[in-house]
Every structure is written in structure tokens, then in C-alpha cells.
Amino acid sequence: MEKITVTLGERSYPITIAAGLFNDPASFKPLKAGDQVMLVTNQTLAPLYLDSLRAVLEHGGIKVDQVILPDGEQYKSLSVMEQVFSALLEKPHGRDTTLVALGGGVVGDLTGFAAACYQRGVRFIQVPTTLLSQVDSSVGGKTAVNHPLGKNMIGAFYQPASVVVDLNCLKTLPPRELASGLAEVIKYGIILDAAFFDWLENNIDALLALDMSALAYCIRRCCELKADVVAADEREESGARALLNLGHTYGHAIEAEMGYGVWLHGEAVAAGMVMAAQTSRRLGQLSVSDVERIKKLLLRAGLPVCGPKEMAPESYLPHMMRDKKVLAGELRLVLPTAIGKSEIRGGVAHDMVLASIADCRP
């Protein structure tokens, strides 16, 4: 069992990583006998895990209600979040309730935002079931829903009480979803840790084969890296946390333009990271050899290195200008300067951004 702490003073919380955590109600601390829970999941995961997890929690003396949401990025919306509020109010649940988010990034982000809003804030626990949510979205307290004009535009910084990562969930993950999660894994190596990027080059096949030892190390290292960044810059005030958005400015444009769910988040981020790498190369920062290393590893992970053929470079910019890193109308980009190093760069000419996107057209 691996344990990591996200250090945020009185709001610090543990991340627990192991296979079989769902079998023990003690895994879900700070829950205790007598507590009331609203378990939030989706229609895909409910048949796989809901009954067994509910039984384990009830065996621990916890009172459990549930709400099952539709599955997909297109349902990460205010209207779907209202279903959670309705379920809470119908029972009813008070301020002493705990929301448990059983699912990937959509369920986790939506449930976390619902917890931040319900009666001005109730406790919630992240139980991520996808690789992407285990290494990224469940950690750090970013909660949100989408708007038709932009991804994650309505949300709050709201930290969970704990994160419970059961590696066995990855055994039921479709290969496309596994690859999507690997995009965020590779991101950590590009922006923060050259040695981890080297490790990924040597172990990507083991991760794709669901080698539990490799997965445990991979998830732990990603969570360590993110926990350190979140502890230093919880609300993206110093710029350190914004580095975690490598590829996202371009990638969110793909998701919004194509329609949420057509491209998985990790697929869009993968293409976006190559676009960012090409931008950095054009600025004379990133070497051609490092661009090729990034592309090669993404391809080995089963990820795209080009944007959608339907999207002209010019169609990216309106979405990119709605990015949360834009300041005073100036586009600011996270760019890799070498494997393991990155920076936030403002003032990049739009023509150069468009040329870099064109570099990545199929």
C-alpha cells in the first residue's frame, strides 16, 4: 500500500493507493459508523462496483444513498449536477453528509463541485476509477462542470477529504481510456521529471499490459509530483500549478470545437502537448530531438500526435482565448523547454501558434 499526503495545513488529506481497497470500509477514512453518504457514480460503473462498494460501506455502519448519472463528458453540466442536488434534498441530506465520487474525471469533477455548492460546502471523497483520474483530476481540488463555450468554466477550488485509488479498477478500463490516462502521465515527465520520462520510455509496454507493480509506481510518482505542485500553489496564483496545464490550452479547443466526448480528454491533451512542443521548437527553446521523443512516446501509448483533420488552425484561437490562463487579453501558453522542464510564456504571436498547430495536422 502506498500513502501520499497533500499538504495544505488543516485541509491536508491522504491519497491511498493499493489493489483491493474496496474490500475494507477502513479504506474510506474519515468515514465512520453512523455517517451518511451519497454515493455518486455513472451508468457504466454502477453494474461493476456500486453494489459491492455499497455493501462494504454499510458493513462498516455507514448509511448509503446513491445517484446514478449518465456517462460521458457531454454530461458534465449544470443540468446533470442538479440531479445530485435533487437526490440530496429528497432524502434529505444535511451539512454532515459526505459525497463519494465513484468514477473518472467527469464524476469526480462534477461531484466535487456539487459538494462545494451543497449547503455552502459538505465533505467529499474521491474514488477515481480511471487512470486519468487516479493520476490527475482526483488530486488537487479542482472541481467544475463544462459550458458550451468552454471546458471547466464553472467550478471551484474545493479539496477532498481523501482520495482512494484501488488499482483493480484499471482491470475493467477500456484500452482507449487507459491510453487517455497515459497522456496525463506522460505530461508529468515532460514538465517536471526527466528521470520519470526516461522510466516511461522503458516501461510504457508494462503499463499498457496492466502490470500492477509498474502501475503502482507510476500512479504514486504522478501523485507525488502533483501533490508537491498543489502544496506550493493551490489556487494557481504563483504560476507553478499552471504548468500542469501543458497541452490543455490547445486540447480544450479540440474538445469544445469537436463536441465534448468525441475526443477523450487525454487524446486532446496528447495532441495539444505536441502542438505546445512545436511552438517551443519554433521559439528556439525545445530541440527537434526532444519533440521527436515526445511524439514517439505518445504514439507508443496509443495516443494521437495530430489534431482533428476537420479543424483548421484558425478554429483553435477563439477557444484558446477563453482559456483561464489568458491575462489582459494576452494568450499565455505552457511550453516545454526540455524534457523535464517547462515555462509559462506570454506574448507568443498568433501566427506562430497557428503555424505550430499546422505542424500537427494529419
UniProtKB/Swiss-Prot annotation:
It is an enzyme of class 4 (lyase). Catalyzes the conversion of 3-deoxy-D-arabino-heptulosonate 7-phosphate (DAHP) to dehydroquinate (DHQ). It is found in: Cytoplasm. It catalyses: 7-phospho-2-dehydro-3-deoxy-D-arabino-heptonate = 3-dehydroquinate + phosphate. Its main location: cytoplasm. PANTHER family: 3-DEHYDROQUINATE SYNTHASE, 3-DEHYDROQUINATE SYNTHASE, CHLOROPLASTIC. Belongs to the sugar phosphate cyclases superfamily. Dehydroquinate synthase family. Keywords: Amino-acid biosynthesis, Aromatic amino acid biosynthesis, Cobalt, Cytoplasm, Lyase, Metal-binding, NAD, Nucleotide-binding, Zinc. Its EC number is 4.2.3.4. Binds 1 divalent metal cation per subunit. Can use either Co(2+) or Zn(2+). It comes from Yersinia pestis. Zn(2+) binds at residues 184, 248, 265. SUPFAM superfamilies: Dehydroquinate synthase-like. This is 3-dehydroquinate synthase. GO terms for molecular function: 3-dehydroquinate synthase activity; metal ion binding; nucleotide binding. One of its GO terms (cellular component) is cytoplasm. GO terms for biological process: amino acid biosynthetic process; aromatic amino acid family biosynthetic process; chorismate biosynthetic process. NAD(+) binds at residues 71-76, 105-109, 129-130, 142, 151, 169-172. InterPro entries: Dehydroquinate_synthase, DHQ_synth_AroB, DHQ_synth_fam, DHQS/DOIS_N, DHQS_C. Pfam families: DHQ_synthase, DHQS_C. Its cofactor is NAD(+); Co(2+); Zn(2+).
